[in-house]
């Protein structure tokens, strides 16, 4: 039976007792509205750790002025049921007032890693992400924390934060979970029309095209970007917002490809903005 914890104080009390007994803690931070991608991370943690904690907290700091914090889907009862079915031990669901009891005296700024891709479109977003993850790590004190590679920029930023702040946690990146036809699973997929849902499969297919070009020896980013863009333009009605090639995890834009790279897509359909990516090349 999964236990619901709603206060920072109680969560810290449980964690301190667990640490004294040598218990390993796995942690999956989420904003709720859970889907199979989240549950894959929970299963991975359950198979590895003595205790698995899932946080469900809609973090106001990562919402911009034109993003509706109040409209973000909240379904704690459903989320609790889902993680219970896959073996999570604790759901940590604090109130905003408990996580942020007063105005923050210290702001965390991410730096260059947040100046590109999603961060460039949502100024301050990753500052909010890093602030809440930093706080959650201090509260939960996990041995392992699980993040999806679908949000690859976020994963790179969290890994850098752990290094810079000397957190005693190992970050585990979990591969993108996809539908049978290749579409990356996302809570946003429900907003697609039937036609858009049929078209959306071409995001992952365009990434496979990029991978094939790379494997055939193509190292000019512009060639890959142009061919992926042309493919998408001929297969989807949505607006292509981004096709980009960056080094990973440094997130430096690439022209002549060397080393490990991250090919990122963003497409805006009528009521849903979908992202997808592929990481390829030697580390």
UniProtKB/Swiss-Prot annotation:
InterPro entries of this UniProt entry? Answer: Pantoate_ligase, Pantoate_ligase_C, Rossmann-like_a/b/a_fold
Q: Which GO terms describe its biological process?
A: pantothenate biosynthetic process
- Positions bound to beta-alanine: 62
Q: In which pathway does it act?
A: Cofactor biosynthesis; (R)-pantothenate biosynthesis; (R)-pantothenate from (R)-pantoate and beta-alanine: step 1/1
Q: What is this protein called?
A: Pantothenate synthetase
Catalysed reactions, as listed in the record: (R)-pantoate + beta-alanine + ATP = (R)-pantothenate + AMP + diphosphate + H(+)
Q: Which UniProt keywords apply?
A: ATP-binding, Cytoplasm, Ligase, Nucleotide-binding, Pantothenate biosynthesis
Organism equals Staphylococcus aureus (strain MRSA252)
Q: What else is on record for this protein? A: The reaction proceeds by a bi uni uni bi ping pong mechanism.
Where does the record say this protein resides? Cytoplasm
Q: What class of enzyme is it?
A: ligase
Oligomeric form and interacting partners = Homodimer.
Q: Where, in this chain's numbering, is ATP bound?
A: 31-38, 148-151, 177, 185-188
Database matches in Gene3D superfamilies: HUPs, Pantoate-beta-alanine ligase, C-terminal domain
Q: What is its main location?
A: cytoplasm
**What role does this protein play?**
Catalyzes the condensation of pantoate with beta-alanine in an ATP-dependent reaction via a pantoyl-adenylate intermediate.
Q: Name one GO molecular function term.
A: pantoate-beta-alanine ligase activity
Question: Any idea which positions bind (R)-pantoate?
Answer: 62, 154
Q: Can you name a GO cellular component term? A: cytosol
